[in-house]
């Protein structure tokens, strides 16, 4: 195991620590000054084998002294808030009760951490595995048994944990890692592509309904036999649900207020729209920018579109060729995880429910066919270049029923 001081501190110190069974022994045998530096979050620790760095611990910004980590318990478990992502230096594990992260610089480390996150049986029978667990412990990513509130697993989160964090992109287990720009305060997720399609704002009631009438009229309609909807209708349902009304940046986070209630204004929900036969949008996938209220079109082949439309047909009975549009709710787990620990998934499902009801009210007012779905249990992978891979935790289809016309016709 190697201890290092980052060069931005002023000078680099590399000290080989021989004979230490764990990184926690730094405070007892590494010297008083070294221990002080470690408490300040200045030192990083690497797992090195045959001159190759397998993983390294990157301390986050610390405003107070950092106490030595508590020993992790066995069986070894990652905290519910732990997740994998692409950071500035590649795959990394983050999301504990600190801003620390462990950069996974080898395929072995990625696969080991992915098994840990998937709650698979992790066998610790070699020095590298023990040292990697020490790194994860230093970063505050393992269950220690001391903080029951943040380490407790809710039943639903335990059941769906793998769905929100894991895919088959990396090895046998694989972490769901999106190639996103990393920021320590987890800002609102926005599309990466520059191309945008602006969506309008029209808060006027199309049918002149009162709120009570819209509540009474809403229902799950499975008829897309009318003239195709377009960006105006898609804009209306997104405007009433996911569009961000106000952003507020603080030292620790970026809070976003929407028209629906969200936990601490830290919702990790975003959306991908699949336009199957919209009259003014090309067939394809579009990532929604909730800040600017725009759609960012994907490019390249999108083989997953037909799979999603096939799922919608099986769940709703609407013919595959008649489906006009779908909305996929995507969870950016990292954004709320720092504050909500084990209840992130439950909180996100409540937010999906609120968004679906807002969409249902707008659809009733506009005479649209709106049908929430369930059972996708998939990701946005394969929807085209520019669409980041994320866990889909809710879906709905949107169209115009037979016997109705577009507004203005």
PLM regions: where:
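Conserved hydrophobic/aromatic beta-strand scaffold that supports enzyme active sites
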Residues: 285, 326, 395-397
């Amino acid at each position: 195991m190697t201890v290092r001081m980052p060069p931005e501190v002023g000078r680099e110190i590399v000290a080989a620590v021989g004979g230490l069974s764990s990184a926690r022994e730094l405070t007892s045998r590494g010297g008083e000054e070294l221990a002080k530096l470690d408490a300040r979050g200045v030192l990083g620790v690497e797992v090195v084998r045959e001159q190759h760095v397998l993983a390294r611990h990157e301390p986050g910004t610390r405003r107070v002294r950092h106490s030595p980590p508590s020993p992790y318990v066995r069986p070894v478990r990652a905290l519910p808030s732990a997740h994998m992502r692409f950071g500035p230096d590649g795959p990394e594990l983050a999301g504990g009760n600190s801003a620390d992260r462990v950069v996974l610089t080898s395929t072995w480390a990625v696969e080991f951490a992915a098994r840990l996150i998937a709650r698979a049986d992790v066998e610790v029978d070699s020095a590298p595995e023990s040292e990697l667990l020490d790194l994860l412990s230093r970063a505050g990513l393992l269950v220690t048994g001391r903080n029951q509130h943040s380490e407790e697993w809710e039943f639903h989160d335990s059941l769906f944990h793998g769905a929100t964090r894991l895919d088959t992109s990396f090895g046998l287990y694989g972490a769901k890692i999106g190639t996103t720009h990393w920021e320590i305060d987890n800002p609102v997720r926005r599309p990466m592509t520059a191309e945008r399609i602006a969506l309008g704002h029209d808060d006027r009631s199309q049918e002149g309904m009162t709120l009570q009438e819209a509540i009474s009229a809403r229902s799950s309609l499975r008829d897309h036999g009318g003239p195709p909807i377009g960006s105006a209708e898609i804009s209306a349902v997104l405007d009433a649900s996911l569009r961000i009304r106000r952003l507020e940046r603080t030292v620790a986070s970026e809070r976003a207020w929407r028209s629906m209630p969200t936990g601490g204004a830290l919702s990790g929900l975003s959306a991908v729209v699949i336009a199957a036969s919209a009259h003014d949008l090309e067939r394809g996938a579009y990532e929604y920018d909730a800040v600017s209220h725009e759609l960012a079109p994907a490019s390249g082949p999108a083989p997953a579109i037909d799979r999603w439309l096939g799922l919608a047909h099986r769940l709703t009975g609407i013919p595959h060729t008649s489906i006009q549009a779908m909305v996929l709710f995507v969870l950016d787990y990292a954004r709320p995880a720092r504050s909500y620990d084990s209840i992130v998934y439950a909180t996100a499902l409540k937010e999906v429910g609120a968004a679906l009801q807002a969409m249902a009210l707008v659809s009733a007012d506009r005479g649209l066919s709106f049908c929430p779905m369930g059972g996708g249990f998939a990701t946005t992978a394969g929807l085209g270049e520019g669409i980041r891979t994320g866990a889909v935790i809710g879906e709905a289809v949107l169209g115009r029923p037979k016997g109705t016309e577009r507004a203005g016709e």
